[in-house]
Amino acid sequence: IIMRNLGFERGGRDIMSTLKLTLLTDLYEMTMMQGYFKNNKNDRVVFDAFYRSNPSDGGYAICAGLEQVITYIEELRFDDEDIAYLRSLKIFDEDFLAYLRDFRFSGDIYAIPEGTVIFPREPLIKVVAPIMEAQLVETAILNIVNHQCLIATKAARVCYAAQGDGVMEFGLRRAQGPDSGTYGARAAVIGGCKGTSNVLAGQMFDVPVLGTHAHSWIMSFPDEYTAFKEYAKLYPN
């Protein structure tokens, strides 16, 4: 199986980046951060992201999701709306909120390249950072990588079973929301799929968009043969 390493065009149009992910974290990450802050704990630490068992009793997994992790880290900052919401929870002190206002990630990220075959208990992403920063990014990194590795792995297994025949990704309508469907399409191409039905994923990630036609097309003609013939006239290739 040939896995693909797909990078974002850094100047490209990432529609999903309009959804700010700073608060995509578990509350206890924030309360622990404040605890570290109050106790003057900001030692440089190492957090490793790994998994314990292969999905679906398989023998391997495929690494995916790194590019979205990078984008998340680069854009990580607390704006006035974030600070106001955290203040409304009445569990964070003003000195800690002032710290968050100027927050920027200053650590280092080490990672296995996307498309690499991976195995249980080996680090996929290593975060080396002050403990408050490493704690904050834990949840989002796991959320992104767990989902996309799962999709890339499933795609790789399907492509292997196809024994050289082309496989396309067509999962948008059954995905758990727009971001899952779109980043899942990218992960499926990393796993070996030839392209996706998802037009937004094609625009965002410059991957081939593919498709057939629906049964509604066939039903709009008097018989199946006519429906196929008319579609073939429009799209002979």
Model regions: which residues?
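Buried, small/hydrophobic-residue-enriched core segments of structured protein domains
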Residues: 7, 12-44, 53-55, 91, ...
